[in-house]
Amino acid sequence: MSKEKFERTKPHVNVGTIGHVDHGKTTLTAAITTVLAKTYGGSARAFDQIDNAPEEKARGITINTSHVEYDTPTRHYAHVDCPGHADYVKNMITGAAQMDGAILVVAATDGPMPQTREHILLGRQVGVPYIIVFLNKCDMVDDEELLELVEMEVRELLSQYDFPGDDTPIVRGSALKALEGDAEWEAKIIELAGHLDTYIPEPERAIDKPFLLPIEDVFSISGRGTVVTGRVERGIIKVGEEVEIVGIKETAKTTCTGVEMFRKLLDEGRAGENVGVLLRGIKREEIERGQVLAKPGTINPHTKFESEVYILSKDEGGRHTPFFKGYRPQFYFRTTDVTGTIELPEGVEMVMPGDNIKMVVTLIHPIAMDDGLRFAIREGGRTVGAGVVAKVLG
């Protein structure tokens, strides 16, 4: 069994626990690692190892997150769990832990609570594609009708936020009993793992997506033309392929006539690599940092979008004062800042440091964007918030 661990051939899937405080997210995380280690090999993680989550920084924001790993026979999972509600909000908005799917933990003793709703809404806004439900503490509920009622409430709540509530897998279990080694409840953890394997599709790898490279620098090389450099965000660029230059200015088409890395010429540049791309017939001044190179027709420039944002607290180095509706900060997308104006939701007059809020942003220049793109909010180069494009509007 111990040989399992070194197999790097299994598909890698990112998941996490979400749900209301004290409904048992961390206990479930410990139970999954323990039961799966016992059944399929791998290492168990104790509750307290997960609970005192280390601090990490994402876009200048401090987040407490625990990362655990576990295996099923067909997949390798990386799982994130956060101790506090604020950590979840920050984590989901910054995309520090991108999830291919989430396990929503709901205590059968309480049913859905305010944070249950908020985490489902956040999941919808930030693009968590799949949710599986673990109905926890079922050992404490004898009444079958009550369990059915809670299940129905959870399904309705999911449907309300455009998740397929009627078809969502719901597992009735007890994380604590499973952790204590009770076989009846351990079986429920195996059932949950089975849903992870079958309900969450294998994520598309960055390399299989359409090519996109955020431009960091532009050089002109005499006799050869213009070179742009940056890290390939997704896909592959091959010499001879057509690309579009998108954002800030009118979209332009050109051809890649060369790819180089560390001064060596290559046939192609792949997701994750830092490359220089030589472009045919483009002048140095026609292209700038903040634009992207992309496979033609795969991404468009936009100026207006709905977003979900988290505003840093004073302790995190954010603003000391609230802001109001005339606020005009910079929005930092990929490699550049663009000034924008904001519209707050109806009835909201001001936003305090430490808040998370939905806002509509209008930028002064178009930026290549899709739903799910992350950004920072800055004032004079200092990060004061983080956000995600929930829906492109225009």
From Swiss-Prot:
Catalytic activity: GTP + H2O = GDP + phosphate + H(+)
Native source organism of the sequence: Klebsiella pneumoniae subsp. pneumoniae (strain ATCC 700721 / MGH 78578)
Pfam families given in the database record: GTP_EFTU, GTP_EFTU_D2, GTP_EFTU_D3
NCBIfam families: EF-Tu, PRK00049.1, PRK12735.1, PRK12736.1, small_GTP
Residues involved in GTP binding: 19-26, 81-85, 136-139
Region (G2): 60-64
Residue ranges, annotated region (G1): 19-26
G4: region residues: 136-139
Alphabetized GO MF terms: GTP binding; GTPase activity; guanosine tetraphosphate binding; translation elongation factor activity
Compartment(s) where it occurs, according to its Swiss-Prot or TrEMBL record: Cytoplasm
Function text: GTP hydrolase that promotes the GTP-dependent binding of aminoacyl-tRNA to the A-site of ribosomes during protein biosynthesis.
Region (G3): 81-84
EC number from the UniProt entry: 3.6.5.3
Protein origin, superkingdom: Bacteria
Binding locations of Mg(2+): T26
Domain tr-type G intervals: 10-204
CDD domains xref list: EF_Tu, EFTU_II, EFTU_III
UniProt-recorded name of the protein: Elongation factor Tu
Principal EC category: hydrolase
Family to which the UniProt record says this protein belongs: Belongs to the TRAFAC class translation factor GTPase superfamily. Classic translation factor GTPase family. EF-Tu/EF-1A subfamily.
Entry annotated with the keyword GTP-binding: yes
Region (G5), start-end ranges: 174-176
Subunit organization: Monomer.
Alphabetical keyword list: Cytoplasm, Elongation factor, GTP-binding, Hydrolase, Magnesium, Metal-binding, Nucleotide-binding, Protein biosynthesis
